[in-house]
Amino acid sequence: MHCVKKVTDDLYWIGGSDRRLALFENVYPIPRGVSYNSYVLLDEKTVLLDTVDASISGLFFENLEYVLNGRTLDYLIVNHMEPDHCAVIGDVVRRYPDVKLVCNAKTVPMLKQFFNFPVEDRTVIVKEMDTLCTGKHTFAFVMAPMVHWPEAMVSYDTVDKILFSADGFGTFGAINGNLFADEVNFERDWLDDARRYFINIVGKYGVQVQNLLKKAATLEIKMICPLHGPVWRENLGWFIEKYDTWSSYKPEDQAVMIAYASIYGNTENAAEILASKLADKGVKNIAMYDVSVTDPSVIVSESFRCSHLVFAAPTYNGGIFIKMDEVLRDIEAHSLKNRTVAFMENGTWAVTCGKQMKEIFAGLKGMNLIEDTVTIKSALADGQEAQVEKLAEAIAETM
């Protein structure tokens, strides 16, 4: 049976949620599931804004047929061609053979790659700030290349002032009845997933997100309808500010994240002692993660949130411990900038991982690397407490 939500008098949400999927993009854990949002506008012309993942295709078509209530579908606006949003375009075309696909020129090759139906004779190609009148409503189209695919664009309803933001302003997490962000405690229950979604999916493309935010700032926006997560109709500025912070690589919090790898517990012990000394110096916002049991997406996200980062690891086969190396390479791939970073290294012989960890961060922009690396030979010796104290002081003094 259909399950739809009314967004405005003539706009409906016809998406759904997947709580069975373990890994988003087969990479990122989503214990709270994920929603795939799609919207239908009932104007003089009917408009579908994006489709959904194949996993909820049955519900999607029930919802679409229910909302159309016997009307044909005139337009399908394709804001983003990633398969979790475009998977059923071919089925839409088969069910509604007269539908026109509204997209930009970069979308056309992707349509041909994913689907076998003739594309050119059913597409309406739009460019920056082109418009489409559907009766009462007029859509304007804003290109958003590499947020986070090259063909991405957003659509703006100039009448109701609604931004259909594609993957922008999305979040992990299934919709549990409440569609609107103001109906839930977003900061408590959704913000961590919103941050982890943005940082891991889009975080590499901060410059491109900043460009889109500048374009959006010229529009009067009363509502944001993303392709994942809740719809925003209140307090939009708060969430937009989060995106501005994340995409400009500014720390969200004055906080210390300590990520450690430990084979037999000795490096963990050193990390615990450092955290205790930081707390003694008045540092209140400290987060600790064991990289062997914490998914890298969490640590990458926390690296964007926190102003100060500490990485503690043993040397392993002459290099950085495998799980730590994975995390650091992921942080590097997301082009993190503007952090204060400290290191602790361990090894029973040939301790080299501290130098190698530093080299990774030396290649990133705006990094303040604290020179006083703590070097441990197997286990932290009693005489080394002063070294940990000195490192704690160096971190605390820069906060």
Task: Outline where the language-model segments fall.
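Structural motif
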Residues: 45-47, 75, 137, 161-164, ...
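Conserved beta-strand hairpin/beta-sheet module of binuclear metal-dependent hydrolase folds
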Residues: 4-65, 154-157, 161-165, 267
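Short acidic active-site motifs
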Residues: 88, 294-299
